[in-house]
């Protein structure tokens, strides 16, 4: 009898224990469910309301700005080169360079996006893929330099993640080959390389400015915030050249070189009263607006660099000396 009661007592104790354990777990879970929202709300309030320097509003604002606010360069307009009458010999025209972030393109752009991009750029899909692979660890690369604004906008309108545009200036020479050696040309970064463009590069070059902008994840400018430093255009350069005389001298020289089957030729026209140079032309010449087929021997300004025999031009001086 005693053993039976003892067994029953043990059974009751086990049942009570089994009831207590689920209840303990229940209270633990419920306490966690109530405590977690309270902790989250408290933390959110701290981040959004309390101006704590380390983890509050200022911290979030700083972190957000660091990821979206950027300093953008404002390109400076290069000074004009004109003849004595103000006719343009070298001008700067606005263009757009296309920039890509290979990391974003590799991760976020679809195969269709890349095919559309290659078609818009006029290159094969294989070529584009090879370039992106080569720069896959970089966050910056040029897709195309100095495109006409409308052509670049067509690419930007595709809305492909990781592609943005940068405003630049490209030099244009209205007189073309007629003033090629005299005026010279600039490189793709707008630095003078030959002729007057090189000789007066410092004065012609402007000072770039900068501004604060907001950019999205793709690198596109969403909004201008403030101007940091304004851009200053370069100084204009007026030459003593008369473009009308320059055209006439160039045509006469080109005709004479062709007529006599000469390898080269130069002509200089001076104002006899002031000594100013009214025209200076050379053959062979080149088109400074398209230097894809440029030959080194056509770049040289022969009228300035080559040694030439004076020939009969000194005879008047000899006769004058004899008369005296």
Where are these regions (language model features)?
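Periplasmic/cell-envelope proteins involved in peptidoglycan metabolism and beta-lactam response
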Residues: 1-291, 302, 307, 324
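Active/ligand-binding-proximal structured segments within catalytic/core domains
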Residues: 93, 311-320
